[in-house]
Each structure stands twice: as structure tokens, then as C-alpha cells.
């Protein structure tokens, strides 16, 4: 009887707990929904105040753009509102998650839930008997790090730190729901369906940081390849450089080797050793074989390497080590693996730092290359130096004609092969200084050439064309104050802001700025420094051109609420910049 009464009491307690937990979750859900509805429906007054404080960054007129410090993005008030809403919703969700984890009485496990739920008399607490692990799959091999077999499953909100969840919430509020997509192989409807169903992930600071962390661990092989290429080009590995030149020559004369060699490497360098490790030969006695050297491919790629990386490759388990593993003592193997002075292994944290440093240097080098290319294209196409740009144009044109005529009569396989050999011979550390000294002229000859060049430049005549100029317009708008003859400055805009203007009919402020110093010329143009803003006194002309029927007084065009006058400025066309 006591057992039945205790079971009834526990059941009633569980029912009461589940009832209040459901009510608690409903209250939290209603608070979240109300907060989301408030954040998504701002009032009209807030929109008008935000637009009046920020304005618009680009005028619709093609001849004028205005810049302002607060011209882009949302206002400060809206930004603070979004931050507060994100912080509030994140706190509520974390509180809800913590409460649900406390209410739940049975924890879930990521591996073999059925074994955890079964009751066994032979089990002693958390220590399970062998019957629970007979049907468990073997997930780990010899190289896998040891760790706990069972890990409680937790939600993403519990695993992610509070600041990560808060940043994701804030980004989801500030960034539009559907960002412009890049080109995809799928159709547009498929992409939209994936976005709606959530298959395509949205922008997340947590995901971005996690991807960079994983990428920093995986970039080691790419930097190893970069080191190998540098060693080959600088002749630090002469055998590998000559072998690479021979392979490049074979590819030049038979491009099919470009497909055959990677397949050969995959089959005999990856698949076959993997099969041997998986299914070793069952032998009790092995004939002794003298090791004549390492693999040619490893010599080509890893010779001349630093101590850390070369030690890893040299002391890694080879083909014969796998075959003889059954006849070796376990103590000897473990002792060999613990010899850190031979393996040269670094800690995982140090590897990540090295990869991050290499990624930083790689991105810096990439930026320098991009800037150099843009600078070359800008100097070549902008015709700032007429002589240099003209020479490059005619040189390129003559090269196109010459190569087009000569290409059918040239064996390009020989040309590419000879060019590669000559280039690497030129880069040899011993041959490079001798070649430079052989082709280098004396100092007297160089000074004579510079003197002739100066005389030639002194005799040159530069015929500069007259720059292209035009006038841009902007309207100085005033708003009527309380007194009849009292007008207050409103803003500078490229729109007249008459009663039929779309912005005025929509009760919105026109795009513009509050100071003439913030007005910038159109792209590719610059203000004439010898010209100032000038008032256009010919009001009738530009009023008739626009078909307006409003009263004119002096240089102003009036309507019941606003008056405006036209200002003009001269601009000069610049050279078209390279994008």
C-alpha cells in the first residue's frame, strides 16, 4: 500500500509540474511574439523622424550625389531598439531553455539510447555490463583519440555562448531576410524554395567563426603545397626541381599526362596503401629487405623541409611498418611514438596559430597582388601618361597580329618546355647572379641613356585637349514658418519638391543634405576650383522647361508651403577610373 500511495503522489506531482511548465512556456512564447510584433511594426512618426535625421545618400538626378554622415542605414533610435529587442528575446529563450532542461527528468544520450533505457540487474549504477555493448557499433579505430563513450545531447542554445546567440539575433533583425544571392547551378525557384524551407543557412556570426576555426585547422595541407612549390622554384630541392621539369615536359608534349598522373597518384598512392592497412598480409616470417631510400614522390615534395613537417613525414608509419606490426612488441611501438624529439610534433593550438599566421600572410600577399594589378590597369588605361599608354597600346596590338600570323608555324610544346627550363635555370641561386652580371650594362652606358632620355623629353611637345565641362544643379529649399514673411531653411536637394513631387505627396523628406560642403560631384567628375556656387536668375527658363505653374518672385519659385531657388556649379570630367 505504501508503494502505491508513493507512486500516486509522484504521479500527481509530475502532473502538476507539467501543467505549470506548459503555462510557463506559453507565457514566454506570448512575450516573444509580442516583442517581435512590436519590433516589426514601427510607427509612422518614427519613420519620419528617422528619415529627417538621416536622409538619403544618393540623389536620383544623374548629375549630383550628396554624402552625409548619417545618410545610410537605420537611425540610432531604431538601432538601439533592435539591440534591446534582441537582448530581451535572447534572455527569454535562454531562460526558457534552462527551465525546460530542469523540468525534464530523463536525459538523452547521443549514442545507444536503448542501452541506457534498459534495466539490468548485473549493472552497477553508471557501470554497464558487457551485454549492453555487444550490439554497439565500433566507431573508433586505433588512431582515434580516447574520450567518453556517452555524451548528453544538449540543444544549440545551451552549447552556444550567450553573446553568440545575441549576435545572431541582432544580425537577423538588422539584415534583410533575403539577401541577394550569387550565381547557382540550380534554378531560381529551387533557390527560393531552399531559402523558404531553411536549407540554405542565413548569415550567422557563430557559423562564420566556427567555419574559420575549422578552416584554420584544415589549411595545413595547402600551406604544405605552397612550401613545396617554393622549394621547387628556388632549387632548394634540386632533385625535385629536375623531376618536376621532366614531368612538365612530358605534359607539354602529351597533355593526357595531366589526367593520367593524378589518377595514378590516387590509385597507387592512396587506395593501395589504404587496402594494405585494412587487410594486412597474414605472415609469421618476413624476409629481411634493406631499405634503399624513401619514396621519390616524398623526396620531390618534402626534401629540404623544416624540422617539424619533415619529421612527421619521415617517422610516419610506412608500408613495411604496417606489415611487420604483428611481429613487433607493443612497448617498442609506444616508445617510438613517444619520442617527441624525433617526430617533432607540435601541439594542436600551435598548429592553429601557425595556420592563422600563414592565412594572414596569404591574404596580405593577395591584396598586394590585386592592388598592383589595379594600379597597372589604371595607369595603362587612364592615359595620365599619354606616351606610356600609347606605347602599351601599339605594343599589344602588334603582339596580337604577330602571334596570330606566327602561331600556325610554331611548335608550342617546344616553346613552353624550353621556356620553363630557361626560367628555372635563371632562378638558380648560383646561375642567377652570373646571368644578371652578363646582361647588365656599365654605369657609364646607363648615365648616357638617361641623358639622351632627358634631351628627348625636353624636345617633346604635349598637346593637351580642352577638358570636358558641364553644369550641375541643386535647389535651395526653404519652409514657411509661422509668420507670413518668415521662411526657414529646409535643405539642399536635387528635386524641386513642388506639390506634385512623389516625395511630397508621400509626406516624406526629399533626398538631400543640410550643407553645400556635403554635396559631391557625379562619379568621374570634379568641381572646378575656379568656380563657386552661383544663383540662376533666369527662373522663367527652368520653370517653363519643367512645366510648372507656380508664382515667381525674384530668384525664388513659391508654393503655399515651400520656396526654392536654383544653384549651379561647373564640373570637369576626369579620366575614367578602372573598377
UniProtKB/Swiss-Prot annotation:
Belongs to the PEX28-32 family. Peroxin-28 subfamily. This is Peroxisomal membrane protein PEX28. One of its GO terms (cellular component) is cytosol. Keywords: Glycoprotein, Membrane, Peroxisome, Peroxisome biogenesis, Transmembrane, Transmembrane helix. Glycans are attached at residue 361. It is a multi-pass membrane protein. Involved in the regulation of peroxisome number, size and distribution. Residues 1-243, 414-579 are cytoplasmic. Residues 40-70 are annotated as: Disordered. It comes from the Eukaryota. The chain crosses the membrane at residues 244-264, 393-413. The lineage of its organism: Eukaryota, Fungi, Dikarya, Ascomycota, Saccharomycotina. Residues 265-392 are peroxisomal. The gene is PEX28. GO terms for biological process: peroxisome organization. It comes from Saccharomyces cerevisiae (strain ATCC 204508 / S288c). Residues 49-63 have a biased composition (Low complexity). It is found in: Peroxisome membrane.
